[in-house]
């Protein structure tokens, strides 16, 4: 055994003493512990706060204002608008006098509450002008000069709202006449500030003569006040005063005051004068702008860099207005200098040598950087105006480098602002939009999601401009000059998906629906469509999953290859509709809802009707419940009599749900759904007046789907014919070489060449070319759920019907040709993608009128029934 360590007993004694010491401390804490009150109020306080329940609202308000506590009085004042709506007469007679008494000694909180209540009453305009003047105006005027600035400003806002309701004479006697004394130097600064704001508000209520005689002397006096705060406040009201006195008095009275204030010793006054001048540019004629205002603006620009940086932020913000207001006045030299000044502001703070000044403390450096960032942000905001200023034709030479700097600015607010303006810049550049392709990629790849969120607000419009704005744009490869577009779009989506900002991710997926306009269906299929599947299967945010589902349906709608369409449909049914996770089956129902909205009725019934109906046997109640909500839309996709067998299957499934459903919530929804289904009117094969527009839209969708399939076949034939044409050309060349020796003889002898005539061949080529052109132009058509007005749809339908009839006649006439590829075709042939597929479950349309375009897709006498794969679902 090892001997015990030395001083072990001492250590033990020390631990025991410490333990006993802690226990004594706890006992002392127990002794000094005070009992906790079980109630916030004593019985006496509760008694004082208790009010008789039988009192009316008016009586209760009077009682609480007279004998209640402050919190009860504040509650009554906050409830004053309700009392005015309920019983205005008694409120004015009994409650309002009590409110006046309370406000004399009220706290700041109660004063603010009263100002808000009075403002609400005035904005509702529920009382006469006489009542407003005699009952409320005096109370408002009495508290305008409250010692608390917040209370005074609240009552001032209420008064300015009351000015709009009061007649001229009331304003003159109750407000304007007292202002003569309130605006004197002997009054407080707060009183004079209030006078400035009131003068700016009431000017528009009087004629020019009254303004000149009664108001302008007060305005001049306040513009020359000894306090810079008063001068600045009055300066900002000169714009409102100028609107009331006309151009002549503005030029003779207001403009000289502004010029004098622009040279004031106080920077805040000079800033107010500059901003007022910018806002009033439209009120001055060309001479005043060129001879008076332009030199002032030039002086402001020079001083802002030399001695007065406080004006830089305001100057950069108002550059757009200055460009617009002074357009056409600049000389070429002044134009160039102003442009250089703008460029300098765009890079302010980015080109400092050796960092900051050593004499500056860190807080000053931070403030200066914030100021410079605000300046560059304002420059980004005004960039579209500067494009107009230099002319879009000169963008590349004058402003492209500046635009590049703004898009690569190190501060997020600057890049965020230029991203907001990107669409405006694209519109202004028009055919020169290709110049900013790289900047679009840069902003799409920006590390900040705020920048991406701002850019994608108008992403479809931007991409559309870029795809059609260039002179060398090609339909199938519009962005060949920007190979990084697709990687940038996919990277932006992945970056949004990895963040917590799911709303940005949802918005981006919604904007992806424009891609069929922009890039080929193969690019969408391989780079985007599979990603939509992944999001639907793995993402945890429901709005994001639904956005991905709708975008996937749009991609499927405009996919140009039959094999790819079948693969997508099969994956939807097998991985979602028959998926093991009930969450995937719910998303399948969401997808079917979008398919009903986007595709034609025949498409839904052919591919998705049976998989949807099969979910009535789903083991999870939530799936069956969601299916019940979808059943009315499923029924609306059926047409009678072609889909009578589908309607019978639907009714059979509903009856089974009614008889076999055990979940009470699902059963309740089933009963409601049955009532809704019974009230629905079925669509007929022939157009009806009630559903004429819907039927016409559906027919348009179906014809577009059929035409897509036809165009795919024609494109295949075109590729085959191009190959044959190349071989025919080589053969023809050899034949001509071999017959060179007998050329003179052949000119005199008729030559008969078997095969189609040149006119017939050229006709068939023209037909194919026109159809291919029409196919390629489909991606430029709008493909939202609502395709437009009835007139547009009618015109489209008539055009397509005429085209179909012409193509049918041409194909019939071409049956006699020797070409095997045309001999096998028939005018009533069924498109390939609408033929039965043994892999995917589909529902054939029932027999109907052969003239109907829907029934022409199938000639089966009996409806084909497809069995779905049995599956076991794990809830």
From Swiss-Prot:
GO terms for molecular function: protein phosphatase inhibitor activity; protein phosphatase regulator activity; protein serine/threonine phosphatase inhibitor activity. Residues 686-730 form a coiled coil. The modification Phosphoserine is found at residue 777. Residues 740-764, 825-859 have a biased composition (Polar residues). InterPro entries: ARM-like, ARM-type_fold, HEAT, HEAT_type_2, PPP4R4. GO terms for cellular component: ciliary basal body; cytoplasm; cytosol; intracellular membrane-bounded organelle; protein serine/threonine phosphatase complex. HEAT repeats lie at residues 215-253, 254-292. Its main location: cytoplasm. Disulfide bonds: none annotated. Residues 718-739 have a biased composition (Basic and acidic residues). Putative regulatory subunit of serine/threonine-protein phosphatase 4. It is found in: Cytoplasm. It comes from Mus musculus. Residues 718-773, 825-875 are annotated as: Disordered. GO terms for biological process: blastocyst hatching. Gene3D superfamilies: Leucine-rich Repeat Variant. This is Serine/threonine-protein phosphatase 4 regulatory subunit 4. Keywords: Coiled coil, Cytoplasm, Phosphoprotein, Repeat. Serine/threonine-protein phosphatase 4 (PP4) occurs in different assemblies of the catalytic and one or more regulatory subunits. Component of the PP4 complex PPP4C-PPP4R4. It holds the Pfam family HEAT. The modification Phosphothreonine is found at residue 799. Residues 866-875 have a biased composition (Basic residues).
């Amino acid at each position: 055994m090892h001997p015990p360590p030395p001083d072990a007993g001492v250590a033990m004694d020390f631990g025991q003493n410490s333990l006993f010491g802690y226990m004594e401390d706890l006992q002392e804490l127990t002794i000094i512990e005070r009992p906790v009150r079980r109630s916030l109020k004593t019985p006496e306080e509760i008694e004082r706060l208790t009010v008789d329940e039988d009192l009316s609202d008016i009586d209760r308000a009077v009682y609480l204002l007279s004998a209640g506590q402050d919190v009860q009085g504040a509650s009554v004042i906050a409830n004053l608008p309700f009392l005015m709506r309920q019983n205005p007469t008694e409120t004015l007679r009994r409650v309002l006098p009590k409110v006046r008494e309370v406000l004399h000694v009220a706290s700041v909180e109660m004063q603010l509450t009263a100002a808000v209540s009075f403002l609400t009453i005035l904005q509702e305009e529920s009382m006469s002008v006489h009542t407003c003047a005699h009952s409320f105006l005096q109370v408002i005027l009495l508290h305008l000069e409250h010692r608390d600035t917040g209370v005074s400003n609240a009552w001032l806002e209420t008064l300015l709202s009351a000015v709009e309701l009061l007649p001229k004479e009331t304003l003159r006697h109750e407000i304007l006449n007292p202002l003569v004394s309130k605006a004197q130097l002997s009054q407080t600064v707060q009183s004079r500030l209030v006078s400035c704001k009131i003068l700016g508000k009431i000017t528009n209520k009087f004629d020019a003569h009254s303004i000149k005689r009664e108001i302008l002397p007060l305005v001049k006096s306040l513009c020359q006040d000894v306090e810079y705060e008063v001068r600045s406040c009055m300066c900002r009201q000169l714009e409102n005063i100028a609107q009331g006195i006309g151009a002549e008095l503005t030029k003779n009275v207001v403009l000289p005051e502004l010029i004098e204030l622009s040279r004031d010793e106080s920077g805040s006054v000079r800033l107010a004068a500059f901003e007022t001048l910018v806002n009033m540019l439209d009120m001055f004629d060309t001479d005043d702008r060129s001879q008076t205002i332009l030199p002032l603006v030039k002086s402001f620009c020079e001083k802002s860099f030399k001695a007065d940086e406080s004006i830089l932020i305001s100057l950069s913000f108002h550059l757009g207005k200055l460009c617009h207001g002074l357009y056409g006045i600049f000389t070429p030299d002044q134009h160039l200098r102003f442009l250089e000044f703008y460029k300098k502001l765009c890079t302010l703070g980015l080109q400092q040598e050796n960092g900051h000044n050593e004499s500056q403390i860190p807080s000053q450096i931070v403030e200066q950087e914030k100021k410079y960032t605000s300046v560059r942000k304002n420059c980004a905001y005004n960039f579209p105006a500067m494009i107009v200023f230099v002319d879009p034709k000169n963008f590349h030479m004058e402003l492209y480098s500046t635009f590049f700097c703004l898009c690569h600015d190190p501060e997020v607010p600057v890049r965020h602002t230029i991203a907001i303006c990107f669409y405006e810049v694209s519109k202004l550049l028009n055919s020169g939009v290709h110049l900013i392709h790289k900047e679009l990629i840069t902003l799409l790849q920006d590390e900040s999601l705020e920048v991406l969120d701002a850019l994608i607000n108008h992403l479809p419009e931007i991409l559309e401009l870029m795809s059609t704005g260039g002179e060398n744009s090609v339909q199938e490869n519009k962005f060949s000059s920007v190979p990084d577009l697709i990687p940038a779009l996919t990277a932006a989506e992945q970056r949004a998906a990895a963040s917590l900002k799911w709303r940005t991710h949802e918005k981006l997926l919604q904007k992806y629906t424009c891609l069929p306009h922009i890039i080929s269906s193969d690019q969408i299929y391989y780079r985007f469509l599979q990603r939509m599947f992944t999001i639907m299967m793995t993402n945890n945010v429901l709005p994001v999953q639904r956005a991905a589902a709708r975008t996937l349906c749009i991609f499927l709608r405009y996919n140009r290859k039959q094999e790819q369409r079948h693969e997508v449909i099969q994956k939807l049914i097998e991985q979602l509709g028959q998926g093991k996770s009930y969450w995937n089956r719910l998303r399948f129902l969401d997808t079917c809802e979008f398919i009903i909205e986007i595709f034609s009725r025949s498409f839904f019934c052919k591919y998705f009707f049976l998989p949807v109906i099969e979910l009535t046997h789903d083991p999870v109640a939530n799936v069956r419940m969601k299916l019940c909500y979808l059943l009315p839309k499923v029924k609306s996709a059926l047409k009678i009599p072609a889909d009578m067998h589908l309607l019978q299957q639907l009714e059979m499934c509903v009856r089974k749900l009614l008889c076999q459903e055990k979940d009470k919530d699902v059963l309740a929804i089933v009963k409601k759904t049955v009532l809704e289904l019974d009230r629905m009117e079925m669509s007929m094969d022939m157009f009806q007046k009630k559903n004429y527009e819907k039927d016409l839209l559906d027919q348009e969708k179906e014809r577009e789907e059929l035409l897509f399939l036809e165009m795919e076949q024609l494109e295949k034939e075109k590729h085959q014919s191009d190959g044959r044409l190349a071989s025919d050309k080589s053969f023809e060349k050899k034949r001509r070489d071999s017959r060179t020796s007998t050329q003179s003889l052949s000119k005199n002898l008729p030559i008969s060449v078997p095969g189609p005539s040149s006119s017939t061949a050229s006709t068939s080529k023209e037909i194919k070319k026109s159809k291919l052109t029409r196919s390629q132009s489909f991606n430029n058509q709008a493909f939202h759920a609502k395709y437009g007005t009835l007139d547009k749809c009618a015109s489209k339908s008539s055009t397509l019907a005429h085209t179909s009839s012409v193509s049918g006649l041409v194909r019939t006439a071409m049956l006699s040709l020797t070409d095997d590829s045309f001999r096998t075709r028939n005018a009533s042939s069924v498109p390939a993608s609408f033929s039965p597929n043994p892999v995917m479950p589909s529902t054939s349309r029932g027999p109907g009128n052969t003239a109907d375009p829907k029934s022409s897709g199938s000639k089966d006498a009996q409806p084909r029934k497809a069995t779905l794969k049995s599956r076991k679902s794990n809830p």
